[in-house]
């Protein structure tokens, strides 16, 4: 163990294991969650060929939503950029009504007394900055009590944004 000048133990940065390879990136639609087959999109197109409503985004395969999963895409100011079809139903909103609203108008941390887990706002900001970590938070719809959802929060792109998948 390293020691500081005064003989006390010192902290040091521990590097991740070299064998921990990051999960591969996959594409998905920001509205329906469908994952297009590689090469299925016309050259330069970013619009989903399945629903024709969402843009194609990328995220880690272990976090990216599956078709019909409930998820939101947020920017670093905690504003909603996209809402999936399943999240519209779950949160009782429509995408045009939800876009550009603050995340706390749709989702809240599930309990103020909980000390474990990540702070929802901090997790979203880190993901929207392009941080490679996957975080989780327990949330509830802002207009409903008694419902708890686990949210997986990670970065997505092409430009850094936060992907919040509700399980």
Feature locations, PLM:
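PAS-family sensory domains
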Residues: 61-64
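Sensory/regulatory domains in signal-transduction proteins
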Residues: 2-40, 44-47, 52-54, 68-70, ...
């Amino acid at each position: 163990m390293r020691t500081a000048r005064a003989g006390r133990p010192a902290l040091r940065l521990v590097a991740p294991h070299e064998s921990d390879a990051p999960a591969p990136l996959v594409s998905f639609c920001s509205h329906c969650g469908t994952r297009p087959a590689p090469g299925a999109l016309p050259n330069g197109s970013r619009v989903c060929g399945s629903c024709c409503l969402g843009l194609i985004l990328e995220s880690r395969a272990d976090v990216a939503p599956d078709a019909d999963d409930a998820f939101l895409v947020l920017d670093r100011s905690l504003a909603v950029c996209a809402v999936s079809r399943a999240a519209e139903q779950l949160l009782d909103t429509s995408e045009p009504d939800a876009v550009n609203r603050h995340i706390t108008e749709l989702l809240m941390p599930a309990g103020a007394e909980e000390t474990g887990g990540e702070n929802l706002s901090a997790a979203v900001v880190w993901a929207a900055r392009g941080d490679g970590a996957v975080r989780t938070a327990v949330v509830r719809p802002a207009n409903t009590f008694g419902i708890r959802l686990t949210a997986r929060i990670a970065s997505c792109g092409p430009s850094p944004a936060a992907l919040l998948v509700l399980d």
